[in-house]
């Protein structure tokens, strides 16, 4: 390990959800006052691997990368600090050091605000350190106010943890119980993000629509009220929130999609299965008809809203009839975008010990069938945008010279040829071509905002 004074370069590798991306940015913010600047892995004196534990091969991916970093560290005579952060760190703790003794630090998802102290402890004691505690004080309260600009589209964590305990999911064990940040702290961070150039803010949480935070006057706000307060921030043009649970989609939040003009007409609402029997075994505590009702109420409140979702196929005990129910829900609902996965066992979760695991070949066939329908729906949704005009938030140059790229209200990448549009600009465009994963557009004369 090198001395603190000489270790001032940093690389953070991030796997997993948008919350992990947010956490990685905040880790960089925590370390910036110590003089750390971000560089490529091969040039870094400290490497942080911010891990995800959702998929089956998460640990294998981690230890493969740790093997590569071990060789790099040894080539420098040990002059590199290696840290494992995030959900695998939280779940496996000391096991990481047992399998990879060249790791210097294992820091859980609730402790990264303590990075300066942990680094100092490593330097003082000349040994590896583990911190996977769930402290009573929320980490958000202890993070520095100064943070790097995220650009025109920014993410803001307002809630963390999960109390739902779905039988397939590790999040309650790696992120802890549901905790909501106070509204005042969220509003203050949002204003800082806007001052730093953000035009769109996406609110983050494992169950973001479960947020019920303390208001400035000591009362409790729900997410709909928070969105209304955020909409009053000058310079903020767009709002989103993710990820939601159907059980927490209340009437006030559905009404917000009708009443809040800054709330974008796109919602990610995971359902996982269309079978009531499988939803019960997943401990989702809702049925497929609740999801159908919510989708209908959202579309009644905001006719132009588009939905995305998550699906798991091959969950233990899933029959052909159960899978057919999922396919029926998909066809009836229609999704602009969806993420689908084969069920994978997560150690320590109830479903991992179920006796009626599904054969991998059956999982593969079901996933292929589901993804074909979801892909067709996404392509159809994109094709339906051709000829429409709407605002695009431009974020920077496109992949080819002379292009400008941005995001539609539905999160689709939109590209305009022969345009040099500054990042952060909202312009009305007309969609002229659809691709499977993006849209091509031409500019109209009206500029919505600059």
From Swiss-Prot:
Provide a Gene Ontology MF annotation, just one.
Answer: metal ion binding
MTTase N-terminal domain: from which residue to which, for each copy? 8-124
Annotated Gene Ontology cellular component terms: cytosol
Cofactor(s) recorded for this entry are: [4Fe-4S] cluster
Look up the EC number in the record and give it: 2.8.4.3
Q: Radical SAM core domain location, by residue?
A: 148-380
Keywords of the record: 4Fe-4S, Cytoplasm, Iron, Iron-sulfur, Metal-binding, S-adenosyl-L-methionine, Transferase, tRNA processing
> Locate the TRAM domain: which residues?
383-445
- Which domain of life does the protein's organism represent? Bacteria
> Where, by residue number, does [4Fe-4S] cluster 1 bind?
17, 52, 87
InterPro entries recorded: Elp3/MiaA/NifB-like_rSAM, Methylthiotransferase, Methylthiotransferase_CS, Methylthiotransferase_N, Methylthiotransferase_N_sf, MiaB_methiolase, rSAM, rSAM_horseshoe
**What is its subcellular localisation?**
Cytoplasm
Where primarily located? Answer: cytoplasm
Uppermost EC category: transferase
The UniProt similarity line reads: Belongs to the methylthiotransferase family. MiaB subfamily.
What's the stated role of this polypeptide?
Answer: Catalyzes the methylthiolation of N6-(dimethylallyl)adenosine (i(6)A), leading to the formation of 2-methylthio-N6-(dimethylallyl)adenosine (ms(2)i(6)A) at position 37 in tRNAs that read codons beginning with uridine.
* Record-given protein name: tRNA-2-methylthio-N(6)-dimethylallyladenosine synthase
């Amino acid at each position: 390990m090198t001395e603190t004074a000489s270790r001032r370069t940093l690389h953070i590798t991030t796997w997993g959800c948008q919350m992990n991306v947010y956490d990685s940015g905040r880790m960089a913010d925590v370390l910036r006052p110590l003089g750390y600047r971000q560089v490529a892995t091969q040039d870094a004196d400290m490497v942080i691997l911010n891990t995800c534990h959702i998929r089956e091969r998460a640990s294998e991916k981690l230890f493969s990368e740790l093997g590569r970093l071990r060789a790099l560290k040894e080539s420098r005579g040990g002059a590199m600090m290696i840290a494992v952060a995030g959900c695998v760190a939280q779940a496996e703790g000391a096991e990481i050091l047992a399998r990879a003794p060249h790791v210097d630090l294992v820091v859980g998802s609730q402790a990264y605000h303590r990075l300066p102290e942990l680094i100092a402890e490593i330097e003082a004691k000349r040994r590896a350190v583990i911190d996977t505690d769930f402290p009573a004080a929320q980490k958000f309260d202890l993070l520095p106010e100064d943070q790097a600009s995220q650009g025109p589209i920014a993410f803001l964590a307002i809630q963390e943890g999960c109390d739902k305990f779905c039988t397939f999911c590790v999040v309650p064990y790696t992120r802890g119980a549901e905790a909501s940040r106070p509204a005042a702290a969220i509003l203050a961070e949002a204003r800082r993000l806007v001052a730093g150039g953000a035009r769109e803010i996406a609110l983050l949480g494992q169950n973001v629509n479960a947020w019920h935070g303390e208001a400035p006057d000591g009362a409790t706000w729900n997410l709909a009220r928070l969105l209304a307060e955020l909409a009053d921030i000058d310079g903020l043009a767009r709002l989103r929130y993710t990820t939601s649970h159907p059980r927490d989609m209340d009437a006030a939040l559905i009404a917000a999609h009708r009443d809040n003009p800054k709330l974008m007409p796109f919602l990610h609402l995971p359902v996982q299965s269309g079978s009531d029997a499988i939803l019960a075994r997943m401990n989702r505590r809702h049925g497929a008809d609740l999801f159908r009702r919510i989708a209908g109420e959202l579309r009644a409140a905001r006719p132009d809203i588009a939905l995305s979702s998550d699906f798991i196929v091959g969950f233990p005990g899933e029959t052909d009839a159960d899978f057919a129910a999922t396919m029926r829900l998909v066809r009836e609902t229609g999704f602009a975008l969806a993420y689908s996965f084969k069920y994978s066992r997560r150690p320590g979760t109830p479903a991992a010990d179920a006796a009626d695991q599904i054969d991998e070949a059956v999982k593969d066939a079901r996933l292929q069938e589901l993804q074909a329908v979801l892909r067709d729906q996404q392509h159809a949704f994109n094709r339906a945008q051709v000829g429409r005009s709407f605002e695009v938030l431009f974020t920077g140059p496109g992949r080819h010279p002379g292009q400008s790229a941005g995001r539609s209200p539905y999160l689709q990448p939109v590209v305009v040829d022969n345009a040099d549009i500054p990042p952060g600009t909202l312009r009305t465009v007309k969609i002229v071509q659809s691709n499977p994963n993006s849209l091509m557009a031409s500019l109209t004369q009206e500029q919505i905002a600059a």
